[in-house]
Amino acid sequence: MKNVKLTLEYDGTNYCGWQKQKNVVTVQEEVEKIIGEITGEKIDVIGCSRTDSGVHAKAYTCNFKTNTVIPPEKFYLVLNSVLPDDIVALNSEEVPMDFHSRFDNKGKTYSYTILNRLQRAAIDRNYVYQYGHKLNCDLMREATKYILGTHDFTSFKSTGSKVKSNIRTIYEARIVEDENKVIFYVTGDGFLYNMVRIIVGTLLEVGEEKITPLNVKTIVESKDRTKAGRVVPAKGLCLEKVMY
C-alpha cells in the first residue's frame, strides 16, 4: 500500500466544487472515478480543501492510498491520459502513510481577478469578474493591512458554515494591477466559507470610495456579517498554492 500525493490544476466552470455531492458533478468524484478505473480499486481521494462551484485551482493538492504497481512518480502521466480536458495532474509523488492533504497543510494562497472595465469579457469570461466602476487601487491596498494578522473573521463568513472557530491568520494580502485587471492575492492559514469573496466584495466598496480603508478595521472588529460587502461571483477565484 502506498500513499500518493497529487497536484491538480482544474477549471471549475463545469463542476459543483471539489467535494462529492449527490446528483451533481464534482472534481473529487471525477478524479476518484478515473483513478479507480486505472487501479481497479475503490479509491477515496482526500482533498486539501473544499472549493465552491465555479472556483478554479492552479495547484490543488490531494492524496489517495493504493496498491497499484504504477510508480507514484509516474502516476500523473497515466492519469492525464484519461482525465477530461478541464482537469490535469501536474505532479504525483509518494508521501508517508500518515500524510493528509487537508490536515497537514499549513496555509493556502488564493487569487481573485477583477476585470475593471465597462465591457464584459469574452475570452476570460469564466475566470474574471467584470466590474465597470473605476477602482481606486491605492485605497484598496491601504485597506488590506487591516485584515493582516490573526482575527475573528466572522464578518467575512457566509451563514451555513459549521466551524468551531472563526479565528484565522492572514499572512499576506496584496493588490496587483495588470492593465485593466485588478488581482487580489491573499495567503492565510485557512479561510472561512466565502471569506475571500466577501473580503473582495468589501474591498470593492473601498475602491469605489463608498467606505474608507479604516472602515475595514471597524468591519473586522464588529464580527457582524451585515457590515461587510457582498459575496462576489465564484468564477474570479482561484486556488494558487497550498503550503506544507
Curated annotation (Swiss-Prot):
Record protein name field:
tRNA pseudouridine synthase A
**Keywords on this record?**
Isomerase, tRNA processing
Binding residues for substrate:
110
Q: Which reaction does it catalyse?
A: uridine(38/39/40) in tRNA = pseudouridine(38/39/40) in tRNA
Q: Which organism is it from?
A: Clostridium acetobutylicum (strain ATCC 824 / DSM 792 / JCM 1419 / IAM 19013 / LMG 5710 / NBRC 13948 / NRRL B-527 / VKM B-1787 / 2291 / W)
What protein family is recorded?
Belongs to the tRNA pseudouridine synthase TruA family.
Q: Which residues form the active site?
A: 52
Q: Which SUPFAM superfamilies match?
A: Pseudouridine synthase (SSF55120)
Listed GO MF terms: RNA binding; tRNA pseudouridine(38-40) synthase activity
Q: What is the protein's quaternary organization?
A: Homodimer.
Summarizing the function annotation, the protein's role is: Formation of pseudouridine at positions 38, 39 and 40 in the anticodon stem and loop of transfer RNAs.
Which Gene3D superfamilies does the protein's record reference? Pseudouridine synthase I, catalytic domain, C-terminal subdomain, Pseudouridine synthase I, catalytic domain, N-terminal subdomain
Q: Name one GO biological process term.
A: tRNA pseudouridine synthesis
Q: What is its EC number?
A: 5.4.99.12
Q: Return the HAMAP family for the record.
A: TruA
Q: Which CDD domains match?
A: PseudoU_synth_EcTruA (cd02570)
Regions annotated as coiled coil: none
